[in-house]
């Protein structure tokens, strides 16, 4: 994407196409270290890929922002800081991150009300309905003072349920994730996903919140009718800036306790302080109160 290619042009030119990652083409890049996600570890071990890397003398490390974001983000950033000779910057980020997390978790510690909540991943883009279980955004719901129903239905990770099951669960709070995805031309029946991201404007984001609700049966849910339906940028699910999703979820679940928190403003300032590209777009939407 232009956002990344302009910020890190040298790295962008050296990308390996999906499916072409072999020890041979990694060696051709002559890396100091290969960084992989924790999601890849088991498959890499079982396939013998790590053994092949060891034999070739390739160094590697694993990071995780997805499986357990609140536990692994700081450790992953410290690891990256060490690898990139940016220990001080990583430590500064972790101080910032930890304070943000504490602001949320300390406030919700005394709140007894834990609203039943579901996170519907890529609603309207993927087939209905993929839920966040006890991982990524599902973990954030729990930390933000919600009762994430996902693990009780799914187990430990995101997976599918039917629209009928979603209606049966009928959560008090419904959060969907949206993004900037191209429509699949092979799908004969596709409902519009929520447009969120760096190129999304608020008006379009609000309008497209209606898309997932057009799936047959979803109109029976109470949350959209009671103003408890929200949309979040999908890429927060696997990113070190997941803490802004935590803020948004806490504000949606407990609006009075987090009336002073403004995730959009905080995220914009984060770009100015930490990122090599400018803030733009829309990342959080509460369609029932978008004009307030």
Predicted regions and their residues:
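Extracytoplasmic substrate-binding proteins
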Residues: 33, 45-129, 150, 158, ...
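Short, structured coil segments at secondary-structure junctions
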Residues: 7, 55-57, 144, 225
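Single conserved hydrophobic/aromatic residue that forms the stacking wall/gate
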Residues: 1-8, 12
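His/Asp/Glu-enriched short active-site or ligand-binding loop at hydrolase and phosphoryl-transfer sites
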Residues: 134-156, 230
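Proline-aspartate-enriched helix->loop->beta-strand connector
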Residues: 13-18, 22-39, 163-180
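Flexible, solvent-exposed loop/hinge segments that line or gate ligand/substrate-binding clefts
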Residues: 169-230, 235
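A residue-level marker of the well-folded mature domains of exported/periplasmic proteins
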Residues: 130-131, 138-140, 161-169, 249
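Alpha-helical scaffolding within the catalytic cores
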Residues: 21, 48, 159-165, 212-219
């Amino acid at each position: 994407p232009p956002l990344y290619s302009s910020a890190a042009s040298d790295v962008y030119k050296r990308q390996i196409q999906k499916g072409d990652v072999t020890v041979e083409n990694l060696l051709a890049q002559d890396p100091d270290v290969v960084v992989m996600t924790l999601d890849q570890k088991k498959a890499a071990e079982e396939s013998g890929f790590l053994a092949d890397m060891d034999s070739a003398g390739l160094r590697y490390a694993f990071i995780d922002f997805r499986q357990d974001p609140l536990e692994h983000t700081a450790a992953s950033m410290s690891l990256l800081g060490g690898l990139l000779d940016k220990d001080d910057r990583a430590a500064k980020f972790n101080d910032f991150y930890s304070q943000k997390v504490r602001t949320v978790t300390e406030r919700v510690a005394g709140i007894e009300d834990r609203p039943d909540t579901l996170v519907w991943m890529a609603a309207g883009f993927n087939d209905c309905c993929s839920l966040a279980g006890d991982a990524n955004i599902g973990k954030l719901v729990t930390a933000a003072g919600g009762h994430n129903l996902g693990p009780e239905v799914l187990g430990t990770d995101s997976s599918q349920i039917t629209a009928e099951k979603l209606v049966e669960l009928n959560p008090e709070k419904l959060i969907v994730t949206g993004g900037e995805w191209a429509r699949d031309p092979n799908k004969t029946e596709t409902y519009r996903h929520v447009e969120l991201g760096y190129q999304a404007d608020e008006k379009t984001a609000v309008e497209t919140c209606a898309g997932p609700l057009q799936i047959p049966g979803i109109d029976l849910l109470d949350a959209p009718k009671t103003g408890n339906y929200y949309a979040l940028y999908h890429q927060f699910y696997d990113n070190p800036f997941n803490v802004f999703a935590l803020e948004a979820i806490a504000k949606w679940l407990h609006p009075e306790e987090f009336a002073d928190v403004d995730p959009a403003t905080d995220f914009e300032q984060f770009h100015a302080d930490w990122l090599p590209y400018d803030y733009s777009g829309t990342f959080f939407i509460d369609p029932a109160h978008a004009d307030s």
